[in-house]
């Protein structure tokens, strides 16, 4: 688990780096998407989006 993106429980404050790539990020302070397939600069991306295959597309950046 990424120590920079993990929290004991949802809503806990913690440090999330801009390169947050964990798949189950619960950090409310993490403004970046944790979806690795989202392209940089996608304003619609949010935590918990679902990647579609190995492409750069995901459920919130179609």
Curated annotation (Swiss-Prot):
Binding positions (a divalent metal cation 4): 34-35, 45, 49
Spans annotated as Beta: 1-30
Binding site for a divalent metal cation 1: 5, 7, 22, 25
Gene Ontology terms, MF aspect: zinc ion binding
Positions carrying N-acetylmethionine: 1
Domain notes: Class I metallothioneins contain 2 metal-binding domains: four divalent ions are chelated within cluster A of the alpha domain and are coordinated via cysteinyl thiolate bridges to 11 cysteine ligands. Cluster B, the corresponding region within the beta domain, can ligate three divalent ions to 9 cysteines.
Gene Ontology terms describing biological process: cellular response to cadmium ion; cellular response to copper ion; cellular response to zinc ion; detoxification of copper ion; intracellular zinc ion homeostasis; negative regulation of growth
Protein name as it appears in the record: Metallothionein-2A
Pfam families the record matches: Metallothio
Parts forming coiled coils: none
Gene3D superfamilies: Metallothionein Isoform II (4.10.10.10)
Positions carrying Phosphoserine: 59
InterPro entries attached to this UniProt entry: Metalthion_dom_sf, Metalthion_dom_sf_vert, Metalthion_vert, Metalthion_vert_metal_BS
Metal-binding keyword on record: yes
List of residues binding a divalent metal cation 6: 38, 42, 45, 61
Keywords, ordered alphabetically: Acetylation, Cadmium, Copper, Metal-binding, Metal-thiolate cluster, Phosphoprotein, Zinc
Annotated a divalent metal cation 2 binding sites: 7, 14, 16, 27
UniProt-annotated binding residues for a divalent metal cation 5: 35, 37-38, 51
Organism field: Oryctolagus cuniculus (Rabbit)
């Amino acid at each position: 688990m990424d120590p920079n993106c993990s929290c004991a429980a949802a809503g806990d404050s913690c440090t999330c780096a801009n390169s947050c790539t964990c798949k189950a990020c619960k950090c409310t302070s993490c403004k970046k998407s944790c979806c690795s397939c989202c392209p940089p600069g996608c304003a619609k991306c949010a935590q918990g989006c679902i990647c579609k295959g190995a492409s750069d597309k995901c459920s919130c950046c179609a």
